[in-house]
Curated annotation (Swiss-Prot):
It comes from Rickettsia felis (strain ATCC VR-1525 / URRWXCal2) (Rickettsia azadi). This is GTPase Der. Pfam families: KH_dom-like, MMR_HSR1. Associates with the 50S ribosomal subunit. GO terms for molecular function: GTP binding. Residues 4-165, 180-357 form the EngA-type G domain. One of its GO terms (biological process) is ribosome biogenesis. GTP 1 binds at residues 10-17, 57-61, 119-122. Disulfide bonds: none annotated. Residues 358-443 form the KH-like domain.
Length: 447
């Protein structure tokens, strides 16, 4: 038995994302008092009382003739078509506005079970005739922010979705905890959402020529070559000095937090905007967090054929110069809008994910260590004593982390550590991932 789907619909700033967060078991949506914060439909597992369901938050709709408005309507329409129940939300403080009436008619034409939710009712609330004129037979007053009225909402939901069909027990979590989480990150307008839509072959995410359309990290569960993958689209990351609006600061914080919990990060770069310091800053942040990374240059179809070879040479030079800590990182050149080379990106993610999880036996590590340190020993110190790295072991994966035992670890230079790391990459075929070394002093400094 599958979980029922409940879709939240309403004009901007009526509290849909607040209710989404209130009912969500898992990830939270960004909440801000600026209308239109949510621009894509978002999914989460929801629960109210004993009833568990799949909850969809939709963009706030208003009368808007431009292309952005049309795309928002398309997102909401898809969410309504998926729904078993629609929760149509209005603002109890402002009362019924013209946009509420238009949207009410829009929802009713789909002839699906629906509940009118009047939000922001912190005090006792009486429905007047304007609410009845919207044409919904079920109404409930709540305060999503304070959690009041949820018992009444539960009763209305159960009335619309018969208990024997909708309430589930002992159902496995459909979102596996061990899936490969791939975050798509980069500067605004690099084509992150277009890339994900092309992969899943669905206009799941809002796209367009406007920079900064994506404002929240959006999760999409997907299967690729029998692998359970969670694709996470993030808001574009600009330099801190150029972020002025509080909403964009929230979006940037959400994107950075998504990187922290990723397995692999796809860094999307616009081929028409030369590699900038911000791209390198994002890549460095990914590496510092210990994530594996795949670099993707999008809009490759817009680069002149006569310029592509020189472009690639310069690009590889910049990456190798500024990101030596992930030497050999995969770089792919794609056109998301034309679906050119997009599957190669997923193949690269799967490959580097396996490397990121690599475990090397202690015997092989120390065989390699002895050979490498003998080939290039550390210099003699004062008094003729030599710093030695005697032994090593792998302490963790994701990323591969190693503990090395030395008679004088504080004398091991950064350049010698880079030598060891780069040699290890080649010896154990570990390109493009962060490798971490920690040094420990042996008990006998003369050994």
């Amino acid at each position: 038995m599958t979980k029922k789907i409940i879709t939240l619909v309403g004009r901007p700033n009526v509290g849909k994302s607040t209710l989404f967060n209130r009912l969500s078991i898992r990830k939270k949506a960004i909440v801000h008092d600026l209308p239109g914060v949510t621009r894509d439909r978002k999914y989460t597992e929801g629960k109210i009382g004993s009833f568990e369901f799949l909850l969809i938050d939709t963009p706030g709709l208003e009368e808007n003739p431009d292309s952005m408005g049309e795309r928002l309507i398309e997102q909401t329409t898809k969410a309504i078509l998926e729904a078993d129940l629609i929760c149509f939300m209005v603002d109890g403080r402002s009362g019924i506005l013209p946009d509420d009436k238009l949207l009410g008619s829009f929802v009713r034409k789909y002839n699906k079970p629906a509940i009118l939710i009047v939000n922001k009712c912190e005090k006792a609330f009486d429905f007047d005739k304007e609410y009845y004129k919207l044409g919904f037979d079920s109404m409930v007053a709540i305060s999503a922010e304070h959690g009041t009225g949820l018992i009444d909402l539960y009763d209305e939901i159960i009335a619309k979705l018969p208990e024997e069909e909708s309430i589930e027990t002992n159902i496995a979590d459909p979102i596996k905890r061990d899936c490969l989480q791939i975050v798509v990150s980069g500067r605004p307008n690099a084509g992150k959402s277009t890339f994900i839509n092309a992969l899943i072959n669905d206009e799941r995410l809002l796209t367009g020529p406007e920079a900064g359309i994506t404002r929240e990290s959006i999760e999409i569960d997907w299967q690729y070559k029998n692998n359970h993958i969670k694709l996470i689209d993030t808001a574009g990351l600009r330099k801190k000095s150029t972020i002025t609006e509080s909403l964009e600061k929230l979006s940037a914080s959400d994107a950075i937090n998504s990187i922290k919990f990723a397995n692999t990060v796809i860094l999307m770069i616009d081929a028409l905007a030369p590699l900038k310091q911000q791209d390198l800053n994002i890549a460095s942040h990914v590496v510092n967090e210990g994530r594996s990374i795949v670099i993707v240059v999008n809009k490759w179809d817009l680069v002149k054929e006569s310029e592509k070879e020189a472009f690639q040479e310069e690009f590889y030079y910049q990456i190798n110069t500024h990101l030596p800590q992930v030497k050999g990182v995969p770089v792919l050149f794609i056109s998301a809008i034309n679906k050119q080379n997009i599957e190669q990106v997923l193949d690269a993610c799967l490959k580097i994910y396996k490397i990121w999880n690599k475990k090397i036996t202690t015997s092989k590590l120390n065989e390699w260590l002895n050979f490498t340190t003998e080939a290039h020993p550390l210099p003699l110190q004062k008094g003729g004593k030599r710093v030695r790295v005697k032994y090593m072991t792998q302490t963790k994966t994701r990323p591969p982390t190693f503990k090395l035992f030395s008679n004088n670890p504080e004398k091991i230079t950064d350049s010698y550590t880079r030598y060891l790391v780069n040699n290890m990459r080649e010896a154990f075929d570990m390109p493009g991932i962060p490798i971490r070394f920690t040094y420990v002093k042996t008990k006998n400094p003369y050994v």
